[in-house]
Amino acid sequence: MSRGIIIIGSGFAARQLVKNIRKQDAHVPLTLIAADSMDEYNKPDLSHVISQSQRADDLTRQLAGEFAEQFNLRLFPHTWVTDIDADAHVVKSQDKQWQYDKLVLATGAAAFVPPIAGRELMLTLNSQQEYRACETQLRDAQRVLIVGGGLIGSELAMDFCRAGKTVTLMDNAASLLASLMPPEVSSRLQHHLTDMGVHLLLKSQLQKLEKTEAGIRATLVSQHSIEVDAVIAATGLRPETALARRAGVAVNRGVCVDSYLQTSHPDIYAIGDCAEINGQVLPFLQPIQLSAMYLAKNLLGGSAPLKLPAMLVKVKTPELPLHLAGETQRHDLSWQITAESDGMIAKGMSGEGQLRAFVVSEDRMKEAFALLKTLSV
């Protein structure tokens, strides 16, 4: 492989892939190109930066130069890739171009900002770079509106509340974590956030944001309005697919790949938050770790289809943490819920009596691995 492997991106997926490639081949040329600094940080830490009084720079774990030296890489930070010529095997930026044998898209996903009037007043916390841009405003803000009551929104609401801020959490749905589990299961977290002082605005839709002398006025479709100092969009992620489209590879919600992490072009692959694996977008750490192991083998001449076991998803709400697994979002499951002072176990059973999903909280999380073994997938 004389021209080697190019990876576009520098996040968790790209780094895991580099480490797995180097375990098997110390010498294949590896080049990483990314728009950011390429310094390493732990993205899940962004859910806890406010309560822990962390600045953006405190999150840095390893500088880009150290990473390059450790794994024998060529790095091109602060570099925007503008085009990919898939047939010629060339990646282009404004003033450079690189040839490759194999190309990996690890471009991640961007925070979705609702298309409302005043959307430019919304902040996002999807990267160290984004946090760096707004950390002073967030630290100084006393009244915070978080739009989106999913996994990230719920984590942020608890964190800001623990930091002593006045928090409003808004969602279109009638319950929190609505895309992950039914309301009877998420209600324990919902009640706890309310007890902490988080003001929930459920079944509510934001219409517009306006700058005022006192801060920001958020007006709902119902015409109810609230004054806040900062508004955070936690309304989900959209896989970054623009480069894949330019390369002419198949795209749906994400960059379409098969079990080998291969796109519709045989020498272009995708991994991480940007990838749609056999129809599924899986923006969680464990699938990415496993994808990196299999993709490293395939890039180096192997043929190993990715096999994903039942996996835990963790909701990092420290005062009431949750672990979930299986098809928790299915509407045809019968839920058996045991809730006690030390935690909750909720089992989603199929009509045939099979365990298809579960959610555990607090001290009952220690039972998660035993439940994983009995989960029907």
From Swiss-Prot:
Flavoprotein found in the keyword field: yes
Principal subcellular localisation of the protein: cytoplasm
Keyword hit for Oxidoreductase: yes
Keywords: Cytoplasm, FAD, Flavoprotein, NAD, Oxidoreductase
Reaction catalyzed: 2 reduced [nitric oxide reductase rubredoxin domain] + NAD(+) + H(+) = 2 oxidized [nitric oxide reductase rubredoxin domain] + NADH
Cofactors demanded by this protein: FAD
Any one GO cellular component localisation term in the record: cytoplasm
GO molecular function annotation: oxidoreductase activity, acting on iron-sulfur proteins as donors, NAD or NADP as acceptor
SUPFAM superfamilies named among the record's database cross-references: FAD/NAD(P)-binding domain
Pathway annotation: Nitrogen metabolism; nitric oxide reduction
Protein's recorded name: Nitric oxide reductase FlRd-NAD(+) reductase
Organism: Salmonella heidelberg (strain SL476)
Lineage of origin: Bacteria, Pseudomonadati, Pseudomonadota, Gammaproteobacteria, Enterobacterales
Gene that encodes the chain: norW
